[in-house]
Amino acid sequence: EKADEKASQGIIGGLFGMRFPFISEGAMPCNNCLSNDALFKVQSDVIRHLAAERSCVFVGRCADYILREHPRCANVFISASKEDRIARLCGMHHIDAEAAEEMIEKADKRRSEYYNYYSFKTWGAAATYHLCIDSSSLGIDGTVRFIEEFVAKKLQL
């Protein structure tokens, strides 16, 4: 698969077309569908527009690549040990470790394929981000504080 997102124009039109009139011409290629590439274009337009208007936090969607020329952008990649990821999913979704591990593998594969296809970079590669952090080392709260401090220093806030 070229990307992990598929949606109908009706959904996208309702979410973006009405609220975000800045979406460029040609982003909606047909009446009943939205291709993966067109969806990426819509998402890119929305991300750029929002980042130009205000401070934002974007999770995924190749936002680091889309905003690569933005002067006030901090790109962070958060990882965690497989054990911590499995334990978190088991607790959140009340599933067994095997199901959690399968979910992780599928999600990571989709994320990697999507990111690598649209950004022409490698998902998770340290050189792609300003900061890479393993949340297993500091815990979730410690990781949040560390990232807040990093962003404040990087952007001179």
Give residue spans per PLM region.
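ATP-dependent small-molecule kinase phosphotransfer cores
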Residues: 1-55
